[in-house]
């Protein structure tokens, strides 16, 4: 059976909130890696510069991700206001709550 619009919207929002956790972990790992490279005096400056660029890229990506989470959350909320289907919407409400908690913490 094909996924419904509700399933698609819920899974998309959950995927984005999960990705945020991965990006936060990547950010921590990259910060630790850059700090370690800065302590090591034998590191090639080019390698350090490239790792700092990777760190900056991750930092720049997060605000865009938060905006996407906000958009998907609002889209799901609007969808639920007019939803007339018979599916259980508790999973959708849970995803909205999780997304809102994530956004509030940032």
UniProtKB/Swiss-Prot annotation:
Keywords attached to this entry: Chaperone, Cytoplasm, Cytoskeleton, Microtubule, Phosphoprotein
Modified residues (Phosphoserine): 94
Keyword Protease: no
Domain of life: Eukaryota
Annotated function: Tubulin-folding protein; involved in the early step of the tubulin folding pathway.
Family under the similarity heading: Belongs to the TBCA family.
PANTHER family in the record: TUBULIN-SPECIFIC CHAPERONE A (PTHR21500:SF0)
Protein name per its UniProtKB record: Tubulin-specific chaperone A
Gene source species: Saccharomyces cerevisiae (strain ATCC 204508 / S288c) (Baker's yeast)
């Amino acid at each position: 059976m094909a996924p419904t619009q509700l399933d698609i919207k819920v899974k998309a929002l959950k995927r984005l909130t999960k990705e945020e956790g991965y990006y936060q972990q990547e950010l921590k790992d990259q910060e630790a890696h850059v700090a370690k490279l800065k302590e090591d005096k034998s590191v090639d400056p080019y390698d350090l510069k490239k790792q700092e660029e990777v760190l900056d890229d991750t930092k720049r990506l997060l605000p865009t991700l938060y905006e996407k989470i906000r958009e998907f959350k609002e889209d799901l909320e609007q969808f639920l206001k007019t939803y007339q289907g018979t599916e259980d919407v508790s999973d959708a409400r849970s995803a909205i709550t999780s997304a809102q908690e994530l956004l509030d913490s940032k």
